[in-house]
Amino acid sequence: MNYPWLDTYCLSKAGAEKDYKEEWAATRYMIRGKLFAMQGGDKEGRAILTLKLPPDQGRLLRENYPDIIPGYYMNKEHWNSVYLEGSVEDDVLQSMIDTSHRLILESLPKRMQKEILG
C-alpha cells in the first residue's frame, strides 16, 4: 500500500470508530455506525479505499485520476473507490477522506454532532 498513514488518518477524524467485517474482508471506518470509509479489495484482490463524495466532485476526480473509480459494490453516484497501489497524491486522498467524514458527520442529528465535536 502506498498510504501507510491511512489507518491513523481515518481514526484521527472526530468520532471515528473502526471494525472489520469478515464477510466482506473489509476494514470499516464509521461515525456512530455510519460508514465514511471502507478499506478492502476488488475482485482481483487489488486494495481499495471507498469514500463518499458529492456526485460532481466524484465525477471530476474520476475524470482526472485513473486510480479513482465509481464505488466498488456501492452506490456509484455517491461513493468512489481509490486503488491504494495507485498514484493519487496524499493530499488529494486526505481531502477525499475529510469530505467523506464531513458528509457523514453532517448527516447525523445535531445533538449527536455536538457530542462528537465536543
Q: Language-model segments: which ranges?
A:
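Charge-dense, helix-prone N-terminal extensions
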Residues: 1-118
